A protein has these predicted regions:
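Zinc-dependent deaminase catalytic domain
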Residues: 1-161
Length: 161
């Protein structure tokens, strides 16, 4: 009888890697965010990434970050967390975990809370001092949704496709 392999990746590494891989589908030239929703028994339920709604051309809608509001991406983009929630096609997300590469904004926090997701594991919190993230944390705390920073292992995962 042989011993099992010891260098397999942890659940956290696996799901955060899946979230980051999903983010690689984003066509946003500045910000690629991915999300992966996982059941209490570690089954992937849904994934999402930031981008425009279905039917809204990536070539016709703006990717700009500055300018008149209607000439920027901000009023058109669906965030990865909301896409993952909307992409879920079965049952309930009650008790699920959300792995996401960037801390959720206030609008995504509302959807997270309403969907029943109970835990958020995030990689980056670079907007922590902004009103949307402060509001997000306030709502998540009030609703009893736990959140924690992903602890990177700096393990290099190489995938050839």
């Amino acid at each position: 009888m042989s011993d099992k392999r010891q260098d397999y990746i942890s659940w956290d590494e696996y799901f955060m890697a899946v979230a980051k891989l999903a983010g690689m589908r984003s066509k946003d030239p500045n910000t690629q965010v991915g999300a992966c929703i996982v059941s209490e028994d570690n089954k992937i339920l849904s994934m999402g990434y930031n981008g425009f709604p279905r039917g809204c051309s990536d070539n016709e809608f703006p990717w700009a970050r500055e300018g008149e509001m209607l000439d920027t991406k901000y009023v058109y983009t669906v965030h990865s967390e909301l896409n993952a929630i909307l992409n879920f096609r079965g049952g309930s997300l009650e008790g699920a975990k959300l792995y996401v590469s960037l801390f959720p904004c206030n609008e995504c926090a509302k959807a997270i809370i309403q969907s029943g997701i109970r835990t958020v594991i995030y990689d980056c919190d670079k907007y922590s001092g902004t009103d949307p993230v402060i509001a997000s944390k306030k709502m998540l705390d009030a609703a009893g949704v736990k959140y924690r920073k992903y602890e990177p292992t700096n393990r290099e995962l190489i995938i050839t496709v």
